[in-house]
Amino acid sequence: MKLFEDLQWRGLVKQYSSDSLIEKLNNGKLTFYIGTDPTADSLHLGHYSSFLIAKRLAKYGHQPIILIGGATALVGDPRGTSERDLAEQEKIFDNFEKLKNQIQKIFPYEIVNNYDWTKNIMAIDFLREFGKHITAGYMSNKELVKRQFATGISFTEFSYMLLQGMDFYHLFTTKGVTLQIAGSDQWGNMTTGIDLVRKKTGEEVFAMTMPLITDEEGKKFGKSEGNAIWISENKNTPEELHNFLLNVSDDIVISLLKKLTFLSRKDIEEIESRHKNGTGYAQGILADTVTFDIHGVSINKK
């Protein structure tokens, strides 16, 4: 099965910026990045599902880079509702180190911190080299920004998408990155990066988003929703992760098997054919597989 076909079958593709990306994914060799801001000291299950795509693409010969946004975390991503409180710099730096150590155990790829290339940029240089390429009207039309105008948005959060666009430009010019992958809530920020690279270099780069992982009620797995399941053993033990997955509903268990495991299409379709609602058969396989992949332990249930 071709890579893009597998990603679509697993429900891991929501938007992509150009049809030519399909050919590059299936037959080319791309350097791509996926990232998170260190606003917490651990990945949660929603992050894990997104970061798994790095492994999926790496298996087909593509080169992943993982970005931890030390700079963007200090600014705060617009939520489309209300202004975030600014995080303390010391806390962000501490979170970065903890995330880096955690990520390296599961995803053995190069890790970069956008604080490293933004910390010494002067305000004048930022405005001249980057701000002049993106208009206020363009930024105001992004969906998250439009929604937040009702309650007010600071210039700090308004500038977040430009900082993320700078990341794409920096990684393109220094590491040859031509693809950014993220959750679907980041689409507006990602297309800003595409436009910034095109305007500054004349080159085409790409973006692809994944649907956010949600529960049976449509709520995403994340700390902003208050239902995060953490990867760190200090926040959720392997047993707690296992129990959570054992109790997911029949409505979403097959979808989670596709998104959270490397089980083949043949294996998952066989599990689906054998699964009967209320038996917990598919949930058991999901819980055992994901817990072992993350923590390297098997949970014996009597």
Swiss-Prot record:
This is Tyrosine--tRNA ligase 2. It catalyses: tRNA(Tyr) + L-tyrosine + ATP = L-tyrosyl-tRNA(Tyr) + AMP + diphosphate + H(+). A motif ('HIGH' region) lies at residues 38-47. One of its GO terms (molecular function) is tyrosine-tRNA ligase activity. Pfam families: tRNA-synt_1b. Catalyzes the attachment of tyrosine to tRNA(Tyr) in a two-step reaction: tyrosine is first activated by ATP to form Tyr-AMP and then transferred to the acceptor end of tRNA(Tyr). Belongs to the class-I aminoacyl-tRNA synthetase family. TyrS type 1 subfamily. ATP binds at residue 223. GO terms for cellular component: cytosol. One of its GO terms (biological process) is tyrosyl-tRNA aminoacylation. It is found in: Cytoplasm. The lineage of its organism: Bacteria, Bacillati, Bacillota, Bacilli, Lactobacillales. The gene is tyrS2. It comes from Streptococcus thermophilus (strain ATCC BAA-250 / LMG 18311). L-tyrosine binds at residues 33, 160, 164. Its main location: cytoplasm. InterPro entries: aa-tRNA-synth_I_CS, aa-tRNA-synth_Ic, Rossmann-like_a/b/a_fold, Tyr-tRNA-ligase, Tyr-tRNA-ligase_bac-type. Its EC number is 6.1.1.1. Keywords: Aminoacyl-tRNA synthetase, ATP-binding, Cytoplasm, Ligase, Nucleotide-binding, Protein biosynthesis, RNA-binding. A motif ('KMSKS' region) lies at residues 220-224. Homodimer. It is an enzyme of class 6 (ligase).
